[in-house]
């Protein structure tokens, strides 16, 4: 009987330890920033901030590699994902300048020449003609770490979703998934607009793989 009791006790302790390890980390912040008319609020306090644009916190333009000749658009840039150390260093530098909030760049959208150029993006094409775009898990784990590191260091992030421009992969590339035009992004009855809303849904309901918290939490 004793061996069985010991086994059950060890199992219970193991489960409790695992539960603690999987518990979501608490945020550095108490509130999301809200708007009251023209005023931004942190709880019941007015929130004011200044910061610089930080476009490479979650995807880097790899200028050193030059243009990708497999991209006939005459531009064809290469990209790479930043390391956790790079993200930590950049965010620390921003905080040391006094920044309280920072805008990062939009999520990148897959387009037809990416495969030939070895380019990875945040948003992948639907698996079916009428399906919704998919998030690239590899890219989103980099994004997760950016958010977690910013939270840890007390930096708020402004997270836009889809680009106006094609070079990064934006509204034109999102529309191309459904054989629509870039302008259809603004038509609320278009497949492109529906896809845009679904991208937002996927992001804000995502559970951060570093903190264990949902983005909306």
Where are these regions (language model features)?
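Bacterial N-terminal signal peptides
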Residues: 10-18
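Active-site mouth of glycoside hydrolases
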Residues: 26-217
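Bacterial N-terminal signal peptides that target proteins for export
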Residues: 1-9
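Boundary at the C-terminal end of the N-terminal hydrophobic targeting segment
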Residues: 19-23
């Amino acid at each position: 009987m004793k061996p069985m009791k010991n086994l059950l006790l060890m199992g219970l302790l193991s489960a409790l330890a695992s539960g603690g390890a999987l518990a979501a980390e608490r945020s550095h912040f108490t509130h999301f920033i809200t708007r009251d008319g023209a005023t931004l609020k942190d709880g019941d306090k007015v929130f004011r901030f200044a910061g610089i644009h930080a476009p490479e916190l979650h995807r880097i333009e790899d200028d050193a590699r030059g243009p990708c000749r497999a991209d006939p658009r005459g531009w064809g840039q290469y990209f790479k994902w930043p390391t956790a150390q790079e993200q930590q260093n950049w965010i620390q530098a921003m905080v040391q300048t006094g920044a309280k909030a920072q805008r990062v760049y939009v999520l990148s959208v897959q387009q037809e020449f990416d495969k030939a150029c070895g380019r990875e993006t945040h948003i992948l094409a639907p698996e079916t003609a009428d399906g919704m775009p998919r998030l690239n898990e590899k890219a989103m784990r980099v994004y997760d770490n950016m958010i977690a590191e910013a939270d840890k260091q007390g930096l708020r992030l402004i997270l836009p979703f889809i680009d106006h421009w094609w070079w990064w992969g934006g509204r034109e590339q999102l529309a191309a998934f459904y054989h629509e035009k870039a302008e259809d992004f603004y038509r609320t009855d278009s497949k492109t607009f529906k896809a845009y809303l679904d991208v937002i849904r996927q992001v804000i309901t995502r559970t951060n793989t570093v903190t264990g918290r949902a983005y909306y939490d």
